[in-house]
């Protein structure tokens, strides 16, 4: 249901419209953005209480939300680009909110500059597309696309570069971990549910063009997504800062979404709908449980005044609501039934196995790594050895209702979202897609996830961690390299 009006006429044949496009994926994104933004606004009343610049914080938060809403309802690629850049500016302001901290200033500049390089590719792609397609619409005339030849795949490839920057795909991921210098509620909104999935939304919005005129580009996105997911999961396994664990987890999960879209190239159109639907389904479920994880991390940081797991341990008895809701989110992202991540992740794995058994097993292995590092994080925070020296200075306590209500709400959504008949709501061709759970894939993935959780329990649940310490010492070079993100910042 688009509504358009002419904004900028260039030639008799080429002009830019502004308007509102409401279709299944834009409506889904509106629900995600509005829901998470509302929870973050409520949560921030408690988290940001007493902070200098309280009004400025809410102004920036509202600007970001408006920009993201404008991006997802854009009726053409140029209008999307306008709001795309507004998202970049508002995220720069939010990441650098603590402008008296050198680290926050450096992080905001880094995010802005890295994404600007990617956005240059996006802009060039838009201009090439507009010139050869003779429109900026998402649905150009087929005759113009055929006549353009190889220029359309080039344009779409450059657009994907822009999406890779926003969605922190390797090697343009380097801005996201440092962006954790912003307030934690900002991380829940920007770096879990909205801005970082803008690249996924871009590919999904342009999906008919990718699969019809640039399948080779879509094919490569799958490999980029898979490598990104593996790289980020490897780094997440050894981080000690809880927000950075979640940051690399986000990068890895976005890789899953990109892979799901990319594997739609070599299978029949009906099966292609599986990857598309699975990607959008995982975008929705991930937004909820990752926002829950970040907000839970905010409560923990608020209680112990530190991001480091060494300052935590044994917090379950002090923070029961945060503990239970964080556990629900960890089970969801690990793909444990009946939480939402089980359903969306398994649809992605099914699509990957139908594309290639090798790709299926690679992504299953990365899913196992996800379960391991998330429960390493969970045990490090809520079990393990309590830091009594630090806790004596300020006894940990449960967060106020303004902060725990969003946790409870998002936990409830995480518990039930997997049962939404997503295939009836969103598909690549507008036709309903019936979800059939592949029992072989589901059984295999859940057994592997449980084994990974068991390994994390054995290594990290006790008061001492001799196995983890011994492994870190034995593979010290690999451990150090992973801890330093394989020196990508230095490169």
Q: What positions do the PLM features span?
A:
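Short phosphate-coordinating micro-motif centered on Lys-Gly-acidic
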Residues: 85
């Amino acid at each position: 249901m688009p509504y358009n009006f002419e904004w900028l006429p260039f030639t008799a044949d080429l002009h830019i419209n502004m308007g509102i496009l409401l279709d299944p994926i834009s409506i889904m994104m509106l629900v995600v953005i509005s829901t998470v933004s509302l929870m973050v606004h409520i949560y921030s009343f408690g988290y940001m209480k007493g902070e200098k610049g309280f009004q400025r914080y809410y102004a920036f938060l509202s600007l970001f939300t408006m920009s993201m809403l404008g991006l997802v309802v854009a009726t053409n690629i140029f209008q999307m680009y306008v709001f795309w850049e507004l998202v970049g500016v508002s995220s720069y302001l939010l990441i650098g909110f603590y402008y008296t901290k050198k680290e926050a200033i450096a992080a905001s500049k880094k995010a802005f500059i890295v994404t600007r390089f990617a956005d240059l590719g996006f802009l060039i792609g838009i201009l090439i597309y507009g010139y050869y397609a003779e429109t900026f619409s998402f649905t150009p005339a087929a005759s113009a696309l055929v006549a353009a030849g190889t220029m359309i795949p080039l344009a779409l490839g450059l657009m994907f570069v822009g999406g890779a920057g926003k969605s922190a795909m390797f090697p343009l991921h380097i801005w996201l971990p440092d962006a954790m210098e912003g307030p934690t509620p900002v991380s829940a909104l920007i770096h879990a549910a909205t801005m970082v999935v803008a690249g996924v939304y871009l590919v999904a919005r342009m999906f008919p063009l990718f699969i019809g005129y640039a399948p080779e580009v879509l094919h490569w996105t799958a490999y980029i997504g898979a490598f990104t997911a593996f790289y980020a999961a490897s780094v997440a396994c050894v981080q000690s800062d809880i927000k950075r664990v979640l940051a690399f987890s986000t990068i890895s999960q976005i890789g899953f979404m990109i892979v799901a879209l990319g594997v739609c190239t070599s299978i029949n159109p009906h099966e292609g709908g599986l990857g598309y639907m699975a990607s959008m389904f995982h975008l929705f479920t991930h937004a909820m449980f990752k926002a829950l994880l970040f907000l839970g991390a905010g409560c923990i940081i608020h209680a112990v005044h530190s991001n480091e797991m060494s300052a935590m341990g044994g917090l379950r008895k002090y923070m029961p609501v945060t503990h239970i809701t964080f556990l629900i989110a960890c089970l969801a992202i690990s793909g444990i039934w009946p939480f939402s991540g089980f359903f969306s992740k398994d649809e992605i794995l099914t699509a990957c196995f139908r594309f290639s058994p090798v790709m299926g097993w690679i992504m299953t292995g990365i899913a196992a790594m996800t379960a391991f590092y998330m429960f390493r994080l969970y045990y490090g925070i809520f079990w393990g050895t309590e830091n009594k020296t630090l806790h004596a200075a300020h006894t940990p306590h449960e967060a106020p209702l303004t902060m725990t209500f969003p946790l409870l709400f998002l936990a409830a959504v995480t518990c039930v979202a997997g049962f939404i008949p997503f295939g009836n709501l969103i598909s690549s061709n507008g036709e309903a897609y019936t979800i059939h759970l592949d029992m072989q894939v589901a059984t295999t993935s859940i057994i592997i996830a449980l084994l990974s959780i068991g390994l994390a329990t054995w290594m990290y649940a006790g008061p001492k961690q001799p196995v983890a310490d011994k492994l870190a010492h034995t593979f010290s070079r690999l451990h150090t390299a992973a801890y330093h993100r394989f020196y990508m910042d230095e490169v």
